[in-house]
């Protein structure tokens, strides 16, 4: 057993060293494909952490088995969320998903800062689009053990005044399958997206979303929590206004 553990540690170190040769986005994609290969070979248990404290928590009727999950942006196309849950993560947020497929910003768009052990991305909502993402969710959800969040956002070419239509169509697609929906209005990498966080635009958008949710609750007999992604760069005054607008429209959290 000790030999196996040492071998796994050696392979992990070798893999990390090798991946640093590649551009950051390529390394990320290789890592995800390797993870899927390990999962398909039924070897994922060798890499699953047994050290995650199982402190259950309930948020808006979402039952989390622990406090560690995967934020939106890693599994953009809902291809790996079931694998992350098998590693011990309590929730996975897929996306951000747009109505139609889009390629995102030009490469390079993920940048390494090795000294700080950080990555900065400016991907720009690259994804395969709502139809394919929904198919992926239906395909892999039976293998998933956790809370599934779906982050939705407006398409790059959608004008701010029409953005509400994108979000409502995306709610039609994903409301039933999601354990929660995240309304992404905070990404700095999508042109004009943050215009939606102005008080006037946000109030209009969230009013439409709130009305749509009432319809979907009646249709599916299911109350899917809706959270809003706010930018960390907002001023305190703007943040207070945005929270007030969200509470007024029965948004569940941030």
Regions found by a protein language model. Give the residues of each.
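Short, Lys/Arg-enriched, disordered terminal segments
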Residues: 1-9
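An N-cap/entry alpha-helix motif that binds or orients negatively charged groups
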Residues: 10-57, 118-126, 130
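Active-site cofactor/substrate anionic-group-binding motifs, chiefly glycine-
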Residues: 63-64, 69, 73, 80-100
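Conserved alpha/beta-domain cores
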Residues: 64, 72-75, 85, 126-253
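Short, conserved acidic/polar surface loops in the N-terminal third of protein domains
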Residues: 80-84, 102-109, 160-163
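A gly/proline- and charged-residue-enriched helix-loop-helix capping module
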Residues: 95-145
């Amino acid at each position: 057993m000790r030999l196996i553990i040492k071998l796994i540690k050696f392979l992990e170190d070798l893999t990390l060293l090798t991946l640093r040769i590649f551009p950051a986005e390529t390394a990320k994609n290789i890592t995800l494909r390797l993870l899927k290969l390990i999962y398909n070979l039924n070897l994922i248990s060798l890499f699953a952490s047994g050290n995650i404290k199982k402190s259950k928590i309930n948020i808006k009727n979402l039952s989390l088995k622990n406090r560690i999950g995967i934020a939106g942006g890693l599994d953009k196309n809902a291809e790996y969320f079931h694998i992350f849950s098998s590693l011990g993560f309590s929730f996975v947020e897929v996306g951000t998903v747009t109505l139609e497929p889009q390629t995102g910003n030009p490469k390079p768009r993920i940048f390494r800062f090795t000294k700080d052990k950080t990555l900065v991305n400016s991907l720009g909502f690259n994804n395969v689009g709502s139809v394919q993402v929904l198919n992926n969710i239906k395909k892999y959800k039976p293998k998933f053990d956790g809370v599934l969040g779906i982050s939705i956002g407006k398409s790059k070419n959608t004008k701010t005044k029409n953005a509400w239509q994108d979000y409502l169509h995306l709610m039609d697609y994903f409301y039933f399958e999601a354990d929660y929906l995240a309304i992404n209005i905070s990404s700095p990498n999508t042109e004009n997206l943050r215009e939606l966080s102005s008080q006037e635009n946000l109030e209009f958008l969230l009013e439409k979303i709130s009305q749509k949710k009432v319809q979907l609750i009646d249709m599916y007999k299911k109350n899917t929590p809706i959270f809003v992604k706010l930018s960390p760069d907002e001023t305190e005054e703007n943040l207070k206004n945005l929270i007030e607008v969200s509470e007024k429209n029965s948004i569940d959290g941030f």
